[in-house]
Amino acid sequence: MGREVALLVVAAVAGVAPVARAQATGMPSFNAPYRAFQRSELGAVFSFPDGGGTGFEGAYRYASGTLDVGLRGGIFDPPGSGKAVLLAGLEARERVITHTIDFPLDGALVFGAGAGLVSGGSTLFVPVGLSLGRRVNPQGATISIVPYVQPTVGFVAGSGRTSALKFGFGVGADFRLSRVLDARVSGGLGDHPFTGVSIAAVWVH
């Protein structure tokens, strides 16, 4: 059953136009299929979209049963003389697939809503994606790694632009460095200006 769900969702998102911002605030940051924390986590995220500029965000997540909910906010500093953009968003993740002999990956639905707010050019993002991956514990190592992919469909609307559905394909890895510290890296594949990379340091509780 898990394999069929995964294939259906991937097929659905693959049919949408091939450009998307990855998550609720429009930065190229994606999510592993399961949380690293028991109760909550707090992190700092740095994003570097193609085309220039840097995003600085704080992120907080907390657990609610099988669901975890995240808040993120910060600033995107565009290249040149462009105005700084205020970023704010809400994300949620729900585990929907557990690996089996037939399908070796775990999966979670990742969805949210957020905005990039700036005078005369604000943008709304409503992404929905399926994260697929599996935790790897290298023999003899003290760290563990979760490599994953996240195809994502996003509704994008805003001032001075046509509302549209967009598609993106996220690739990432979460590194458990210690019992309380994660390092994370992810990036979006697609057309300019929606590709880029993101790195994060996260304290888990």
Where are the regions that the model predicts?
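Generic detector of solvent-exposed, compositionally biased contiguous segments
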Residues: 5, 23-30, 78-93, 164-168
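Cleavable N-terminal export/targeting peptides
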Residues: 1-36
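Outer-membrane beta-barrel transmembrane domain signature
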Residues: 25-36, 41, 49-52, 64-66, ...
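Short N-terminal amphipathic alpha-helix/helix-capping patch enriched in small hydrophobics
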Residues: 52-56, 67, 86
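Mid-chain, structured segments of secreted extracytoplasmic proteins
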Residues: 68-105
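Exposed, low-complexity/repetitive linear segments and helix-based recognition motifs
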Residues: 1-2, 88, 171, 179
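Surface-exposed strand-loop-strand hairpins of Gram-negative outer-membrane beta-barrel proteins
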Residues: 45-58, 75-77
